[in-house]
């Protein structure tokens, strides 16, 4: 993707999020809920954090995108997730799945696969979580991963489920099943705070609310988040200040800041 086109689209979509304040319905984990809500507000969207079965269909009806995060699972949450995804699919609401810990336990892996097969538009996870969706074995410890995915693996997951995949790691891989991009931005500080991956999902879901090319929306969200992370790290003295500065930088992000630092390459 040409950087000039990405800059133009990013300028437009940041402005559209600010103008329309789209509702992003989150069914997410307890650990990340506060941070996810705050980062969604910072980018300009409007978060709803609810998993009550009785109101899911109504909330999906007013949402512009749906984020599913399986970080803290139980049977009630699993039922809420499936209800929400089915409702979103029937209403044309785009869905992002964050398969937290998939590959670490059978429950997480089976839930992630069930949601993916139900029909979502973007899957965002670390590279071990993404590989688990191919039933490939790796080393996934809780929400952490020591697995490195190849471009071909990420492309295969995207083609298998017919969606966009964002596989995070030292280098982030993004694929729609045809092309594969590698993004070399971000900071190691993102790996030192809880909910950093969950917040990334919220930012991407916010772009999905206004940009229906989900490969582009994923690139936009990932680029904004990683560059904001770099900017935050430069002014932070530790992990607590980094978390606050990350949200600050997302609230001030511009296309110019992103393109100035962006290291993006199409590899397939």
Curated annotation (Swiss-Prot):
This is Hydroxyethylthiazole kinase. Its cofactor is Mg(2+). Belongs to the Thz kinase family. SUPFAM superfamilies: Ribokinase-like. Keywords: ATP-binding, Kinase, Magnesium, Metal-binding, Nucleotide-binding, Thiamine biosynthesis, Transferase. GO terms for molecular function: ATP binding; hydroxyethylthiazole kinase activity; magnesium ion binding. It catalyses: 5-(2-hydroxyethyl)-4-methylthiazole + ATP = 4-methyl-5-(2-phosphooxyethyl)-thiazole + ADP + H(+). Coiled coil: none annotated. It is an enzyme of class 2 (transferase). ATP binds at residues 124, 168. GO terms for biological process: thiamine biosynthetic process; thiamine diphosphate biosynthetic process. It comes from the Archaea. Pathway: Cofactor biosynthesis; thiamine diphosphate biosynthesis; 4-methyl-5-(2-phosphoethyl)-thiazole from 5-(2-hydroxyethyl)-4-methylthiazole: step 1/1. The keyword Magnesium applies. Gene3D superfamilies: 3.40.1190.20. Pfam families: HK. Disulfide bonds: none annotated.
């Amino acid at each position: 993707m040409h950087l000039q086109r990405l800059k133009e689209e990013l300028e437009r979509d940041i402005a559209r999020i600010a103008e329309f304040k789209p509702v992003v319905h989150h069914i997410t984990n307890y650990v990340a809920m506060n941070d996810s809500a705050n980062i969604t507000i910072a980018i300009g969207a409007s978060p709803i954090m609810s998993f009550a079965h009785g109101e899911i269909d109504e909330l999906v009806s007013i949402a512009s995108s749906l984020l599913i995060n399986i970080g803290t699972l139980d049977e009630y949450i699993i039922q809420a997730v499936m209800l929400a995804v089915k409702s979103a699919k029937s209403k044309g609401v785009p869905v992002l799945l964050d398969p937290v810990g998939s590959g670490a336990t059978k429950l997480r892996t089976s839930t992630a696969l069930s949601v993916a097969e139900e029909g979502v538009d973007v899957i965002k996870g670390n590279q071990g979580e993404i590989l688990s969706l191919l039933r490939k074995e790796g080393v996934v410890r809780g929400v952490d991963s020591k697995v490195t995915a190849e471009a071909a693996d990420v492309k295969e997951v995207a083609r298998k489920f017919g969606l966009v995949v964002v596989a995070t790691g030292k280098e982030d891989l993004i694929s729609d099943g045809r092309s594969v991009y590698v993004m070399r931005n971000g900071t190691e500080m993102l790996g030192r705070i809880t909910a950093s991956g969950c917040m990334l999902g919220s930012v991407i879901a916010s772009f999905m609310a206004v940009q229906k090319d989900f490969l582009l929306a994923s690139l936009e969200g990932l680029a904004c988040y990683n560059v904001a992370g770099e900017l935050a790290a430069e002014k932070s003295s530790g992990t607590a200040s980094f978390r606050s500065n990350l949200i600050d930088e997302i609230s001030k992000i511009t296309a110019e800041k992103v393109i100035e630092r962006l290291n993006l390459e199409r590899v397939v």
